[in-house]
Regions:
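Flexible, low-hydrophobicity surface segments
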Residues: 1-141, 251, 306
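Gly/Pro-rich active-site capping loops and adjacent beta-alpha segments
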Residues: 3-6, 105-125, 147, 205, ...
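Short, glycine-/Ser/Thr-/acidic-enriched flexible segments
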Residues: 22, 42-44, 66-68, 95, ...
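Short coil/turn connectors at secondary-structure junctions
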Residues: 31-34, 57-59, 85, 92-95, ...
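Alpha-helical support elements that line or immediately flank enzyme active sites
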Residues: 37-62, 96-116, 184-225, 232-252, ...
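Beta-strand segments within the central parallel beta-sheet cores of soluble alpha/beta enzyme folds
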Residues: 64, 219-225, 253-263, 290-295
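Helix-loop-helix junctions that connect adjacent transmembrane helices in secondary transporters/permeases
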Residues: 68, 131-213
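Glycine-rich and small/hydrophobic secondary-structure elements
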Residues: 77-106, 233-285
């Protein structure tokens, strides 16, 4: 029996340090084409019109009209669309895909697409959200989840306290900075759609595909490729590019690869939540802390995602 203090090699150790590991961008099935995402350039607005150019032969667009069932990513609150329809709620929100055999041609097409917006004032901070009035997105309140916990007789400790020390701390967004960006390959054989990619939670993508396509498990396959870092950044978010490549593969009957550029990934993927933390510490005559009242407010961004789980 080995000692529990002895180091062991991970099963993927040799391939990763030698550079032999095959990641999603390294895979090129026969007949594969590429996809790029056209995203919102404004933080919040109504979409008034989308003008697309005449597409070269073999190139096509995928948007919300290609979703046969529900245009939603099922997480906790089911509030985030797969593609924006009438409104965008953050810079980088996906509106459509442009797909084809040459990346350079795809980028040229994207440059010619014109989107007309009607701006809406965005809410960009916790303080702004708290000062909002109806109509609210979730029920009759400016927040979508609220938890309270208490241990011991707090009120009695407050009465005994001789002084109170109050502190406020703020944390900002944190980017996971995984080496491999969000990347997916979708394939369709006429009956089953297969999505391979960089992810942490394959069954999140399975559920998203079931909701979007209206199919059962027998027609959906999701494979986690060797993942070049994630750190929480590839939990629920890969459902979006996962459904995107599936829709493109079904439409084209060809394998479709979607790999985010670094700037694109940082701009549009989920982050560690910014927070405001207020702590009131109650001290007795010996300056021992006998109670604490802690309030943590977390910025969930444009959509709820896994915010309630993180909090």
């Amino acid at each position: 029996m080995n000692k529990i203090s002895e180091s062991i090699k991970r099963y993927d150790f040799e391939d990763k340090i030698s550079g032999k590991a095959i990641y999603t961008p390294d895979v090129h099935p026969e007949g594969m084409i590429y996809a790029k995402t056209l995203r919102s350039k404004v933080p919040r607005a109504k979409i008034l019109s989308i003008q697309t150019p005449t597409l070269p032969e073999g190139y096509f667009i995928v948007d919300h009209n290609d979703i046969p069932e529900k245009n939603v990513i099922p997480v906790v609150f089911d509030d985030q669309p797969i593609f924006a329809t009438d409104e965008v709620n953050y810079i980088g929100e996906p509106i459509l895909l442009v797909c084809g055999s040459e990346k350079s041609v795809i980028l040229e097409i994207m440059d010619k697409i014109i989107i007309e917006y009607q701006p809406i004032k965005p809410i960009v901070s916790i303080e702004e959200a708290q000062s909002c009035r109806a109509p609210f997105i979730f029920k009759q309140q400016p927040h979508f989840v609220h938890y309270e916990y208490q241990k011991g007789n707090f009120d009695e400790c407050v009465k005994r306290a001789k002084r109170v020390i109050s502190d406020e701390f703020r944390t900002g967004y944190q980017e996971q900075a995984y080496l491999e960006t969000q990347s997916m390959i979708g394939d369709y054989d006429g009956h089953t759609v297969c999505v391979r990619g960089s992810m942490q939670c394959p069954y999140y993508i399975v559920e998203s595909l079931k909701v979007a396509l209206g199919w059962d498990d027998s027609r959906i396959r999701v494979i986690q490729m060797p993942t070049g870092g994630a750190f929480g950044g590839k939990e629920e978010y890969p459902s979006i590019p996962g459904v995107h490549v599936a829709l493109a593969a079904i439409k084209s009957k060809r394998p479709v690869q979607l790999v985010y550029e670094r700037q694109e990934d940082i701009q549009c993927s989920t982050k560690r939540h910014p927070t405001i933390i207020r702590i009131n510490s109650y001290l007795d005559e010996s300056d021992d802390i006998i109670a604490r009242d802690i309030e943590v407010k977390s910025d969930g961004g444009a959509y709820a995602g896994l915010s309630s789980v993180v909090l």
